[in-house]
UniProtKB/Swiss-Prot annotation:
Organism field: Mycobacterium tuberculosis (strain ATCC 25618 / H37Rv)
Annotated spans, Disordered: 1-22
Family from the record: Belongs to the ROK (NagC/XylR) family.
Keywords recorded for this protein, A-Z: Activator, DNA-binding, Repressor, Transcription, Transcription regulation
Keyword Disulfide bond in annotation: no
Cross-referenced InterPro entries: ATPase_NBD (IPR043129), ROK (IPR000600), WH-like_DNA-bd_sf (IPR036388), WH_DNA-bd_sf (IPR036390)
Protein name listed in UniProt: Transcriptional regulator Rv0485
GO biological process, one term: regulation of gene expression
SUPFAM superfamilies: Actin-like ATPase domain, Winged helix' DNA-binding domain
A molecular-function term among this protein's GO annotations: DNA binding
């Protein structure tokens, strides 16, 4: 396992939680939407605009000053917000004039992205910023043993965060996810009804939410992206491609999550002689398919042995390096994948006709030189009015962002309820009780 540190702090959850077991009721469906509840609206306004005064919060949320005051007081008492008296306007009288901001230092959430080859464990603050990431090979054994191994890795990682309280765990992965129970069918890993949520909830003693990785990435665009979405936002199509392909819809400020799980575009019919495949999208544009074509074309000597031992990321990096060095075959191969992807995005756009099209995943972001081919194929393949494609704001960190937002979604939808479920609110009340009696 190796670590990519984003902060010099080495912090961990509160001690004493390691052996605390939670029943399966601590598996919670993710809330991948912009909540319009008063507390959520106020917290979102402060998160996006803070430090900010209560009058500005009222103006941006359309809530009354009285409602804003009540919510701010509750969030201050819960420790999610803090006052900035040093920023108060000169001459202002009374606490409602004191700006507030998110009190992010005391808390952390844990995101886990279980990929086909690599699992990322991500520490996230209340702004949705990645504090630190570690990566470990995804266990290839049966679901029970694999989940036990992943839970042990996550538990060891949480022990680093001694000065912050862990609030929630968000898990993202491919396959068919039952978010209500946290069980997953993942054919590529050989998992059938794998109890992902229950195992992690029991092992970590924290609430756990499990989501389809593409739904989660779309949720990150909606809730953590640089753009300011409103709860009544229009429709966006999110298309993902890397080792797998997938799509998600954002409708009215909410990621559309069908009860039976996300749809699939893996068997979408495509054609590419250079990439081969079975005439289906995923088997044609996945990293594995591109590397298989590179082996056939003898672009990179020795690429076969590395990919068979799980080094596909390294092999793709080698292919990109060769293309950037001027190898014409490598450039044509990556351009062909871009062409096929652009045509597939055009087909989805014409079928669903969203107001916005967003693409993400390393098939789009690791080689931005090919985005011109993606856009050209998209324009040529669509029969509707011209529309731009927007690339994810998270670049090659989109999997981290997806896992992070699933770990934060409960807090963003119901800040006080999330603290209560995690046990943090009760602990804070116990900590402050002696002060109140003094």
């Amino acid at each position: 396992m190796y670590s990519t540190n984003r902060t010099s702090q080495s912090l961990s959850r509160k001690p004493g939680r390691k052996h605390q077991l939670r029943s399966h009721r601590y598996v919670m469906p993710p809330s991948l939407h912009l909540s319009d509840s008063a507390a959520a609206s106020v917290f979102r306004a402060v998160r996006l605009r803070g430090p900010v005064g209560r009058d500005v919060i009222a103006g941006s949320t359309s809530l009354s000053i009285a409602t804003v005051n009540r919510q701010v007081i509750a969030l201050l008492e819960a420790g999610l917000l803090r006052e900035r008296a040093d920023l108060a306007v000169s001459g202002a009288i009374g606490r409602p004039r004191v700006p507030v901001e998110v009190n992010h230092e005391p808390f952390v959430t844990l995101g886990i992205h279980i990929g086909a080859r690599t699992t990322s464990i991500v520490a996230t603050d209340l702004f949705g910023r990645t504090l630190d990431t570690v990566e470990t090979p995804t266990p290839r054994n049966a679901a029970g043993a694999a989940l036990t191994s992943l839970a042990d890795s996550a538990d060891r990682y949480l022990q680093r965060w001694r000065r912050r309280r862990a609030l929630w765990v968000g898990v993202t992965l491919g396959g068919a996810v039952d978010s209500a129970t946290g069980h997953v069918d993942h054919p590529r890993l050989g998992w059938r009804q794998a109890p992902v949520g229950p195992v992690l909830a029991d092992a970590l003693g924290l609430p756990v939410s499990v989501a389809s990785h593409v739904d989660a990435m779309a949720g990150a665009e909606l809730m953590l992206g640089m753009r300011r979405f409103a709860p009544s936002s229009s429709t966006s199509l999110y298309v993902y491609a890397r080792e797998t392909v997938g799509y998600a819809l954002m409708i009215g400020g909410r990621v559309h999550c069908p009860a039976s799980g996300p749809g699939t575009i893996a068997p979408l019919p495509v054609h590419s002689e250079m990439l081969g495949g079975t005439g289906q999208l995923e088997s044609t544009v996945s990293d594995e398919a591109v590397l298989a074509a590179a082996r056939r074309l003898r672009i990179i000597p020795g690429i076969a042995s590395r990919t068979r031992t799980g080094g596909s990321a390294t092999a793709i990096t080698d292919l990109l390096r060769v293309a950037r060095a001027g190898n014409q075959q490598a450039k044509e191969l990556l351009a062909e994948r871009a062409r096929v992807l652009g045509g597939a995005v055009a087909l989805l756009r014409d079928l669903l006709n969203p107001d916005e099209v967003v693409v993400g995943g390393q098939a789009f972001t690791e080689y931005p030189e090919a985005m011109e081919q993606v856009e050209a194929a998209f324009t040529a393949g669509s029969v509707l009015a011209p529309r731009d494609i927007r690339v994810t704001v998270f670049g090659n960190r989109v999997q981290e962002a997806g896992a992070g937002i699933v770990s934060l979604s409960g807090l963003y939808a119901d800040p006080l309820g999330a603290l209560r479920r995690s046990g943090a609110l009760d602990a804070r009340l116990q900590d402050t009780a002696p002060e109140a009696l003094a």
